[in-house]
Amino acid sequence: MQLSQWRSSGHFLTVDGQQVFYKAEGTGPVLLLIHGYPTASFDWARMWPALTNLFHCVTLDMPGFGFSDKAPKKYLIKEQAATISEVIRHLGITSAHVLSRDYGDTVAQEMMAQQLENNLAFRIESLHLLNGGLFPETHRALFIQKLLLSPIGGLLIRLLNKNAIRKSMHNIFGPNTPPSNQDIDDFWTLISANNGHKYMHLLLDYMKQRKQYRERWVSALQNANVPLRLTAGMADPISGAHMVARYKQLIPNADVIE
């Protein structure tokens, strides 16, 4: 599916004064898909046809990403979880299986923490994590991410362009599955929509939040009251084999697909 088709087949919902792009298609049990950084719900486009044959799939561009509104502010993971809950409530959904990746894993961890506190607006039936920074001590941020998170990030972000995104994406894709030129074009369209490329450094605050809320978010996985699985690409330089090893150390009866 082309990016233009993805957008035209979606919808917008106003949440706390922000326009949030979402898609909901298919029949069957509800599957909520949560995207990564710095992309958007289009992460799931290639598997969308297969998944919607089996599930009622719901996904969205979290504020600050993709086609949703973007602003020069730091986005709290807790706020992203609240936005997702509002979309789920709007759709009349009371329970869902969750599939998440990267940044979305952190949002899913916060949602699981809320569920354990009986404070989530819907019930998570199962949680399937893909590669992500589940533990701040194993997260190997790219050099450019570290720079953008630093005090000079606001200056460096002015130099961000499609070529910089191309270089970063080639560094994190698998050696046998490099991004195509079309992939890079789509990534840049999503990042730069609504001037989002000017605010990417602010979104990186999630790396600080992972340290601040480590105990809460790791505990959410250790005490998860639903089936929990991790599927990991071991070659991921940011959250690959080293993260999986830590996952097996910390998560009881770890269910891992490598």
Where are each of the predicted segments found?
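Conserved hydrolase catalytic core segment
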Residues: T94-H139
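Short beta-strand/loop motif that positions the catalytic acidic residue
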Residues: A224, L230-A232
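Catalytic histidine neighborhood in serine/cysteine hydrolases
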Residues: A241-V244, K248-E258
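Active-site loop/oxyanion-hole signature of alpha/beta-hydrolase fold enzymes
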Residues: V15-G17, K23-E25, T59-Y103, A113, ...
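Alpha/beta-hydrolase fold catalytic core
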Residues: M1-L31, T52-F55, R89, I93-S95, ...
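Conserved alpha/beta-hydrolase catalytic His-Asp/Glu region
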Residues: T138-R140, L159-N223
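Conserved HGGG/HGGXW glycine-rich cap/lid loop of the alpha/beta-hydrolase fold
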Residues: Q18-F67
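Acidic catalytic loop of the alpha/beta-hydrolase fold
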Residues: M234-S239
